[in-house]
């Protein structure tokens, strides 16, 4: 009963605080070739960070846990795709010309480089929270970075 009351108060507080500040992030859509350039560079940056992190901290991890961390890279990109799009739209609008694939590759590489995934890996590893490796993770890991699904319905 106490837990129910606590959850109810937490929900009410969340609604009260977020009522005026929370905004839905509208979806931004881009053409397929731009999406592919972004995904390839973002995942390449995340994977480079993971390789460096595994070189230092990966000795204690099993092969399955390492595969799960590669999945975490892809899922992180999928989860934050629309937030990336807000930043990307702002950057491409600032160009003053129509963007090309190289612009999206450069922005994707910047995202992959700037996001501190090593902190995230340390967090997961330190708290023993690396997810169990499941069949759907294997499916996504086997995909080329260009084929990883994201919430984009561009042409």
Swiss-Prot record:
GO cellular component terms attached to this protein's record: acrosomal lumen
Keywords, ordered alphabetically: Cytoplasmic vesicle, Fertilization, Signal
Subunit structure: Monomer. Homodimer. Molecules associate into dimers and then rapidly dissociate again. Interacts (as a monomer) with the egg vitelline layer protein VERL (via VERL repeats); each VERL chain can bind multiple copies of lysin.
Record localization: Cytoplasmic vesicle, Secretory vesicle, Acrosome lumen
Coiled-coil ranges per UniProt: none
Keyword tRNA-binding assigned: no
Tissue: Sperm (at protein level).
Function: Creates a 3 um hole in the egg vitelline layer through which the sperm passes. Does not have enzyme activity. Species-specific interaction between the sperm protein lysin and the egg protein VERL exposes a basic surface on lysin that may dissociate the egg vitelline layer via electrostatic repulsion. Plays a role in ensuring species-specific fertilization.
Organism whose genome encodes this protein: Haliotis corrugata (Pink abalone)
Name the record gives this protein: Egg-lysin
């Amino acid at each position: 009963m106490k837990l129910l009351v606590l959850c109810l108060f937490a929900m009410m507080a969340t609604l009260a605080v977020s009522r005026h500040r929370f905004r839905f992030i509208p979806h931004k859509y881009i053409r397929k070739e731009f999406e592919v350039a972004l995904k390839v560079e973002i995942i390449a940056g995340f994977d480079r960070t993971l390789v460096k992190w595994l070189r230092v901290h990966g000795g204690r991890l099993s092969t399955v846990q390492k595969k799960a961390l590669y999945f975490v890279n892809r899922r992180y990109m999928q989860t934050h795709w629309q937030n990336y799009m807000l930043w990307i739209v702002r950057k491409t609008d600032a160009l003053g010309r129509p963007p090309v694939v190289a612009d999206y590759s450069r922005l994707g590489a910047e995202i992959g480089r700037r996001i501190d995934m090593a902190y995230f890996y340390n967090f997961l590893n330190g708290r023993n929270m690396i997810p169990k490796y499941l069949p759907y993770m294997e499916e996504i890991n086997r995909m080329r970075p260009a084929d990883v699904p994201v919430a984009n319905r561009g042409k």
